Amino acid sequence: MKKLLAFAVAMTLLLSGCASKPAAAEKTPEELTTLYAQAITDNGGEMVEYNPVISEAKEEDGSAFLLEMMGLKAEDMAAFGISASMMNVQAYGIAAVKPAEGKEEAVKEGLQSFIDMQKMNFEFYLADQYEVASSARLETLEDGTVLMVMAQDQDSVFESISKAILEG
């Protein structure tokens, strides 16, 4: 009887150890907004100092215009963090966006239109900035975040921001 009881306890412990771990809780839009702003600020490079991250659209401070310039609509996004230059002297923009339900393609199309516009703006103007715009990265991360990086050294900036978001 003792052996049977010990065996039952051992099997229970063994099987409970094999159970899958619960998935990490989904972050709220507010938590994602904070995460995106911090990831871009910490890893976005020098240009973030001159172009602070915005995370809400307001008419009075130009952030609504910046969203429009980036091809984004507030209703297409559940959360976002964006740093971009409103002056057309450098090809620069970083956007981390959690699309609203069913809006991933709209977000990606908007950001791709921003990339295309920047390429066109710099094609005959500043060759080095045209190269930056042409090398922009736009991808959807494992957690559903759409990340666009157009900046000097975009690959390392993209990887750093991506890592910060996925580990956040």
What are these regions (language model features)?
Residues T33-A37, I94, E104, K108-Q112, ...:
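Extracytoplasmic/secreted envelope proteins and their assembly/folding machinery
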Residues M1-L4, A8:
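Positively charged n-region of N-terminal signal peptides that target proteins for export
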Residues V53-Q90, A106-V107:
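Short, compositionally biased low-complexity segments enriched in polar/charged residues
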Residues L13-G17:
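C-terminal motif of bacterial Sec signal peptides marking the signal peptidase cleavage site
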Residues E104-E142:
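Short Gly/Thr-rich strand-loop-strand
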Residues A19-P22:
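Bacterial signal peptide processing site
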Residues A91-E101:
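A short acidic-to-branched-hydrophobic micro-motif
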Residues M86, A96, Q129-G168:
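A short, solvent-exposed beta-edge/loop patch
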